[in-house]
């Protein structure tokens, strides 16, 4: 996992270059789009959907593949699937065949998704051995950001900074973690929380930042770390610090902040004697038996 974490600046650069050559496999401006996935891929889809709508390129929804609204019309459905074998994704693509244009973004084209989708974008250079996703997720989102014209070299530089700088002091010792986001970074907050749960078995939550005051702040204690992706709502940092919790304000590109959160998940796992590459009860892909 450490090697995969460290390679993200390079895989982001390659993905951004790849975006220009895959214009037909990715949504055109004005298309009504849904993006689907499971776990990490769903959360990257949430971030992309918000980014695409904010940039004025068309209505975009994100769904867990198992919760796709079958009767809702779209011009294109994008499936994010690292393995290309996830049952819910393949079943949905099969259901949609001939009804709507589908695109899949995957790390392995030698899998059933190659035949299941109409168009394919392969990020094999971002594939991973670890069960826990890190670089494939951020590389796929970089591809999509670049296709929207929103990728910058500063994001890559910030990723290098996120890998090089020490984590905030005393963060590893916290007993509870909360990640907050606004707009497209809500998806990143959800993903950061999932990384902490998977890799370090930590009690971790995620919310839209403005929702934190509406109940969740009640569990905040001196053992809590509250981490904000992007600009915080006015007064929230002070309110969180007032509970005794540790506040972490993101200063880097939000996707680079996710890299910092990935590092935190590994550090907490190491401190607890856990193997972050092979979390309990998890496999690299969820393949369900046929009905």
Go through each PLM region and give its residues:
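YjeF_N-associated NAD(P)HX repair module
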Residues: 7-10, 18-19, 135-176, 270-291
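A general structural motif
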Residues: 157-166, 204-214, 230-231
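An N-terminal, well-structured beta->alpha segment
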Residues: 1-31
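Glycine-rich phosphate-binding loops that contact phosphosugars or nucleotide phosphates
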Residues: 29-157, 163-164, 182, 225-251
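A cross-family phosphate/adenosyl-ligand binding-site feature
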Residues: 1-10, 124-136, 254-258, 278-279
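Anionic-ligand anchoring segments at beta-strand to alpha-helix junctions in alpha/beta enzyme folds, i.e.
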Residues: 18, 26-76, 175-221, 263-266, ...
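Phosphate-moiety recognition in structured ligand-binding domains
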Residues: 1, 117, 231-232, 239-291
